[in-house]
Amino acid sequence: MNIASEQHVAAIVIRLDGDLTVDDSDNFKRTIRESTNDFSSDIVVDCTSLSQIDSVGLESLLWLSDEARSNNYRLRLACVPQTVTNIFRLTRLDGAFSTHPSVEAAARSLN
């Protein structure tokens, strides 16, 4: 998995590229901590290029949501692929995340 981040006015945007699976979980968490300066801003995760997610990947997103919330910041997911949306629905996590059709829409929801 490749993870890139950039600071925007409303939030830090994290772009995921590839799989978010058991093999990527530790790197995901480490990179998120570094990219967000230990959760000092709202976060938008751009899932456009997220190709696959497993149960550990879901746990990683839940961890990110919990960390953001415990630091009084908000998390938004953008451009979630249908396959991942289906997994959210099957695991009953579809209500656990605020999802948006674009990064811009996710950022606007933070205002």
Task: Show which residues each predicted segment covers.
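Short beta-strand/loop segment at the start of cytosolic alpha/beta domains
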Residues: M1-R15
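Residue-level detector of flexible, active-site-proximal loop/helix-junction positions
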Residues: I12, L20, E104
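Amphipathic alpha-helical interaction surfaces in cytosolic regulatory modules
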Residues: L20-F97
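Short hydrophobic/aromatic patches at helix-to-coil boundaries
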Residues: A107-N111
